[in-house]
Amino acid sequence: MQDMLQRQSEAAATGMSHSLWAQVHGDKIAIHDPIQTRTFRQINEAANQVVRLLRERGLKEGDAVALLCSNRAEFVEVLAACRRGGYRLTPVNWHLSVDEAEYIINDCDAKALFAETRYAAATQAKTPQVTLKVSIGDDAPGFEPYAKLLGQFDGADITDPTVGSQMLYTSGTTGRPKGVYRRNTAGLMLANVAEPDDVQLCAGPAYHAAPLAFDVASSMLMGIPLVFIDRWDSEGVLKIIETYKVTRSHLVPIMFQRLLNLPEDVRKKYDVSSLRYIIHGAAPCPPEVKKAMIDWVGPIINEYYAGSEGGAGFIVSSEEWLTKPGTVGKLPDPAALRILDDEGNEVKQGDSGTLYFRVSPIAPFEYYKDPAKTAAAHRGDYFTLGDVGYLDEDGYLFLTGRTAECIISGGVNIYPQEIDNELIKHPAVEDACTIGVPNEEWGEEVKSVLTLNPGYAGSDALAKDIQAWAREHLAGFKVPRSIEFVDELPRSPAGKIQRKKVREPYWAGRARSI
């Protein structure tokens, strides 16, 4: 066992995890996706071919590669290539509008773009700095076909691997998304020996930080099969678990809720007893939902608390959580967390304050090309995600709110300023304040409170027109689910809209405001 852990760590340190597993069990299926399968040997060979392609086209270590791709084998192949070729990979959310995807591809300084061309965001984005465009799936003008290109290169292991990095984008509080750049993510990958029958399910989009880490990267590291689903279907997920005898998965609370909403006779149709480990995070989970899941699948549900920027190692098992419902885990190291008031002073045990985490010495983060935002997120050797919480007498952390303006809907982070910036371009809108309001299924939903320009009056028809206009400029999940018109918005003495005051009435009477 120790020998295998050592081999895993050494392979991960150079980005060669699939090379290790190609040697150990090369003919074992590594990827099941909705249209194809790949063995560990095939994934490894494709990764080597992609590296050789990128090198031939002039990319050097540290250069950026953008990947706009659904949950399919090619996503893993390009990821594996960047990990061993020394490239900085940015997965792009394929739900984004053309303008949003275009901004990220350009902002990350991508020199190569691998894209599934069924998405308009891939084919219509203007990306003049990209020198290599590779189509996954259907061909498209201006793109070179993935399979045809790879066939021109040797699949044998490269002899000079250098571990790469990744940069994920998080929506910006002032409008544009920001790249969260962590230079040494390989240093965060902890080796773990899998059971011989382990199978991982990736039920969320692989471009998202949590599925990328807990489903894709962990299965790569441990050498276990990964089952991809492209779109969520509650009963379909149960069928996949039964068919592939899935043992592990990362899920988010809205997935729990949708599974629990299935009729009991439907849930009983499928054997999910193979499940041994479920991990969840990304959004607060209502205690009654989590308790119902534990009652159904057993005490196999583990919760973590962290962000793309990092965290303090909070994780809580089902057994612990049942004694402390609502907690996100016990403080693993007193030096890893500080809870501060608005003046930067430590709060007393039991009092809420802004959470600050110690910066990882292994993989510190920066907001790409934004030193001001990087500095604003830090206090010395600590940084904040903008969350508010407290530690109880036993050292368990409970979240109570957020100082940041982030909306978390179905586990997806949405920053309202980005929405406001688009809504005020509508001819009827004078000003906008977008907030998250309670939603029993999604946790929060997007609501925009608007003031109107002279000559316009609030109406259902105008609200629908503004929503339709927003759909042309924003990803669907950012479009306000509801719109309210008001005569004025509360402002600070400096004239800034006080989003917190707009939000408060919708959360009145609730134990927490997230």
What spans do the regions from the language model cover?
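AMP-binding/adenylate-forming catalytic core of the ANL superfamily
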Residues: 52, 75, 96, 113-115, ...
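Conserved AMP-binding/adenylate-forming core of the ANL superfamily
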Residues: 10, 29-72, 76-80, 97-102
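AMP-binding/adenylate-forming core of the ANL superfamily
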Residues: 349-363, 382, 388-389
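A short helix-loop-beta submotif of the ANL/AMP-binding
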Residues: 64, 70-90, 94-98, 106-112, ...
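Conserved AMP-binding/adenylation subdomain of ANL enzymes
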Residues: 185-202, 207-247, 262
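ANL superfamily adenylate-forming
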Residues: 35, 121-168, 176, 262-263
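Conserved AMP-binding A3 loop
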Residues: 39-41, 165-189
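Gly/Ser/Thr-rich phosphate-binding loop
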Residues: 168, 221, 246-251, 262-323, ...
